[in-house]
Regions:
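Conserved catalytic core of the tyrosine transesterase superfamily
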Residues: 1-401
Length: 401
């Protein structure tokens, strides 16, 4: 049995045990996990008492010292500072300890922080896209500017080309093109803010790689149905996972769009779903009956989730909105259940497009379903319509058919 009452707590944090227990219960933590976090509180509280410190002194540095002292005493060998994150979060949320101290940014960090704000506010990019762009930006200013903001104004086309060529030596073609896109974005920002006096984004070389050079990676016919059938709809997790997979398979939604989906995005009277897409776009889609049924079953089983408006929630602790990694894990588990290789959520999107193509849907309709802004993006699926391609293929010289 795991009972909180068995944990001896003394010191200035002892009065907060009940608050921590209530917070953990509200987030779905079980008795075993709750007891472990109360033990962390007891360790910190005893340390404060021994050192004569107030609760406000608790921070990451104190935790590191505490863990080091325990290790030196031969205790808690498996204990790490990250084990105290939940406790620190609780203490800060209650105002018991101050928020994380704001670190003074270096000049180059100030520059990159301005770029991040530009991506968020003016470009309205998704969080995952911003993360990729910021990684490229940090790499570029480190290599091309030696982490010195004063050298940004002196950037030349040769510096830009030299950086991209260097990336090409250590990265594959797909990764290089992602870096190229990020560097172009950063240089456009520099020019927009007057940090450089020439539009150097035009000097970024592209890697020669045709958009139509590869086939879209899709699913074999029938696999999508097997993934859906693998969900145990007798459980809340199974009902939720079935709804998630249904949206991937039937509407071809992107994983970020499922993450952003809120309960209020569905207009049940008109049978319409508003998708929060890339670039801040909001696209209305008709809600098929089977998709609506899957969502109704999940929401009915899930019940109210307090003030949180997100559609998909974690069932296990810590409860809260599902992140992209959680949604990808739903697909990964389904693949394991049906005995197929792990597949990406985007391959389910490709699978929908190819299935529509097999049933005679024209490319422009497929583009509407997938919400492509450019028909050229949809044109890649023409390469997998083998029946149509066979009618226009030239016979090989000398062949009989």
């Amino acid at each position: 049995m795991y009972e909180v009452s068995r944990v001896r707590v003394s010191g200035p944090l002892a009065v907060h045990v009940s608050g921590l227990v209530g917070c953990l219960a509200g987030r779905g933590y079980g008795s075993k996990s709750t007891v472990e976090h109360v033990r962390r509180l007891a360790q910190v509280s005893r340390w404060l008492e021994r050192e004569g410190l107030e609760p406000g002194a608790v921070d990451e540095a104190l935790v590191v010292r505490l863990v080091g002292a325990l290790h030196s005493a031969g205790k808690g060998r498996s204990l790490a500072p990250r084990s105290f994150r939940v406790l620190l979060g609780f203490l800060r949320s209650q105002g018991i300890v101050p928020s994380e101290r704001v670190r003074v940014l270096t000049p180059i960090e100030v520059l990159l922080d301005g770029y991040r704000n530009y991506l968020v506010v003016e470009r309205a990019l998704a969080a995952v896209t911003i993360t990729g762009y910021m990684g490229t930006a940090g790499w570029f200013v480190s290599e091309a500017c030696a982490n010195d903001p004063c050298r940004v104004a002196a950037l030349s086309a040769a510096d830009v080309a030299r950086f991209v060529v260097g990336v090409g030596r250590v990265r594959g073609p797909r990764s290089v093109n992602e870096v190229v896109v990020g560097v172009r974005s950063l240089l456009r920002y520099f020019y927009l803010k007057g940090l450089i006096d020439r539009p150097l984004a035009q000097a970024v070389p592209w890697l020669a790689r045709g958009r139509m050079a590869t086939l879209p990676r899709t699913l074999e016919p029938g696999v999508a149905g097997r993934l859906l059938a693998s969900c145990d709809r007798g459980t809340l997790v199974g009902v939720r996972d079935f709804a998630v997979l249904t949206l991937f398979v039937r509407l071809g939604l992107r994983v970020g769009e499922l993450t952003a989906m809120e309960v209020g995005d569905i207009d049940w009277r008109s049978g319409e779903l508003t998708v929060r897409g890339k670039g801040g776009w909001r696209d209305p889609l008709p809600l098929p009956v089977d998709v609506g049924d899957a969502l109704v079953a999940y929401l009915t089983r899930r019940g109210p989730s307090g003030e949180c408006r997100q559609m998909f929630m974690r069932i296990r602790a810590p409860r809260g909105p599902m992140a992209m990694t959680d949604l990808r894990a739903v697909v990964r588990r389904a693949c394991a259940r049906v005995g197929i290789a792990d597949t990406s959520t985007h391959r389910l999107r490709h699978g929908l497009a190819c299935d529509l193509l097999r049933h005679g849907a024209p490319l422009f309709e497929i583009g509407q379903v997938l919400r492509h802004r450019d028909l050229e993006t949809t044109a890649v699926y023409a390469k997998v319509d083998f029946a149509v391609l066979a009618t226009v293929a030239q016979r090989w010289p000398g062949s009989e058919s």
